[in-house]
Amino acid sequence: MATRHQRAAAAPQPANRGAAVAAGKQKAAATAAAGRPGARNRQALGDIGNVLNAHVVDGKIQLPEGINRPITRSFGAQLLKKAQENAVAANKIVVQNPARKEPAPKPAKKVVPRPENAAKASTGAGVNENKKPSESEGAGSSSGGSALKYSRKKVVNTLTSVLTARSKHACGITEKPKEVVEDIDKLDGDNQLAVVEYIEDIYNFYRTAQLERRPTDYMSSQVEVNPKMRAILADWIIDVHYKFELMPETLYLTMYVIDRYLSLQPVLRRELQLVGVAAMLIASKYEEMWAPEVQDLIHVCDNAYSRQHILAMEKNILNRLQWNITVPTPYVFLLRFIKAAGGDKELENMVFFFSEMALKEYGMASLCPSLVAASAVYAAQCTLKRSPLWTSTLKHHTGFTESQLRECAKVLVNAHAAAPESKLKTAYRKYASEQLGRVSLRPPAVCLA
């Protein structure tokens, strides 16, 4: 009987004995590894000496002669890698799937910033340079190796915008801060008589009502009465009002009734003082708690008129005015405008002095009471040399600008300058008293003279 070694020697040998032996060893090793629990598959060798001469033809790997093993994925990758290295060494580039070449990006045009924008452009360029590494990294990490394209467009100020900004700056057309208007009623919140909740509505109504039933230019319709006679009557009314110690509202309403009646009815010269006395009686009954007696009015007229004359003229005036004597006078606006000016007692006395001087001026009889009151405040500001002369608060509450008041205020300042030499100086002597601060003795405003 032949032994095991003799049978092995007598068996026919394969053509490639080395390959068969190697295959048997690999199979035995794989079987042994599969039999061991927890065993891992052996990694492919990094270098296989017997495939150094592998070739790639039409994207397929051609094994050397004598190698018949199946080509796995990892084994094929190793063969391809080795073949590419050999081809590169021989200056022959082997590419498995040649990709489509993309045209190289054109270099970006260089933008030269203007001198005034050099700092901004340099700052923006520095920011873009800092962003370049991150953008290249993002392109490298994209799937498929495709580079991401970022469109970076620099913001450059156009020539038109630059010229427009320069023109506005040269012409002074810039955004000016809003004018600050002071809340003049903030201290009267707890005063119910101040009616802070609807004080603005009240004065808006006054501004509308002052345009109704205004005296007109009546001197052309008067035959025996002229502006000088009216000024004499107004000066006498101021004197009587001061001696009777009546309310200020009574004085301004008296002059309104006189002017309104003269606008509607021609009056004889001898009856002009009678009209003034009857108008004061009407205003006193409307404004005062205790109106003067008719006998007292007869006395101040030096008994020129009887009781029947005064009462008859009173009735005639009321009928001619249709009993409409509820009108805004300059006094109601003076109170509001003095408060807006934030004036002290000296400014208040000076304003009332100019307003009483305005009562003697016939040219101001037909003007709006708000305009006369605002002009008196402006003239007082100029006389006392207050700064600023006209604030945004005064402009808001009066509704007039400084230029709108200048002409009317100039008339008042001229009357103040002529008062010491005038025969009609009742208001001048009244406000020269120590009780009223002697404001009439102040020198007239030079800026309006």
Curated annotation (Swiss-Prot):
Residues 1-37, 98-147 are annotated as: Disordered. This is Cyclin-B1-5. The keyword Cell division applies. InterPro entries: Cyclin, Cyclin-like_dom, Cyclin-like_sf, Cyclin_A/B-like, Cyclin_C-dom, Cyclin_N, Cyclins_cyclin-box. Keywords: Cell cycle, Cell division, Cyclin. SMART domains: CYCLIN, Cyclin_C. The keyword Membrane does not apply. GO terms for biological process: cell division; G1/S transition of mitotic cell cycle. Belongs to the cyclin family. Cyclin AB subfamily. GO terms for molecular function: cyclin-dependent protein serine/threonine kinase regulator activity. PANTHER family: CYCLINS. Residues 8-37, 136-147 have a biased composition (Low complexity).
